[in-house]
Amino acid sequence: MDLRVIDKSDTELSIEIAGEDHTFMNVIKGALLETEGVTAATYDVNPEQSGGQTDPVLTIKTEEGVDALEALEDGTDAVIEKADNFTDAFEAAA
């Protein structure tokens, strides 16, 4: 997975995530929408200027005083925690 920051301000971040598809992008978007201080999280695989399918571009917008990059870190930590909890539950059930 390769990441490329496209645009960054204190309350907004657009980042290209190479090699990922809707499955991963929906998971990270969902976690971000549950993250405190995040006002919007979306992704696009067909930006208007691209002329077709591209690597997904994730865009995060946050409340004033909430750094968008830190919100992304919080969202990814939440995904990791959910995956770990699922693994533990699966192993306990097996």
From Swiss-Prot:
Example GO biological process: DNA-templated transcription
Give the EC class as a word. Answer: transferase
Mention any one GO cellular component term assigned to this protein in its UniProt record.
DNA-directed RNA polymerase complex
Q: Where in the cell is it found?
A: Cytoplasm
Domain of life from the UniProt record: Archaea
Which chain regions cross the lipid bilayer?
A: none
Entry's InterPro entries?
RBP11-like, RBP11-like_dimer, RNA_pol_Rpb11_13-16kDa_CS, Rpo11-like
**EC id:** 2.7.7.6
PROSITE patterns attached to this UniProt entry: RNA_POL_L_13KD
**GO molecular function annotations of the record:** DNA binding; DNA-directed RNA polymerase activity; protein dimerization activity
Please write the reaction equations for the catalytic activity of this protein: RNA(n) + a ribonucleoside 5'-triphosphate = RNA(n+1) + diphosphate
Q: For this UniProt record, give its keywords in alphabetical order, as a comma-separated list.
A: Cytoplasm, DNA-directed RNA polymerase, Nucleotidyltransferase, Transcription, Transferase
Q: Describe the protein's quaternary organization and the partners it interacts with.
A: Part of the RNA polymerase complex.
The record's similarity note reads:
Belongs to the archaeal Rpo11/eukaryotic RPB11/RPC19 RNA polymerase subunit family.
Q: What does this protein do?
A: DNA-dependent RNA polymerase (RNAP) catalyzes the transcription of DNA into RNA using the four ribonucleoside triphosphates as substrates.
Identification of the protein by name: DNA-directed RNA polymerase subunit Rpo11
Q: Which gene encodes it?
A: rpo11
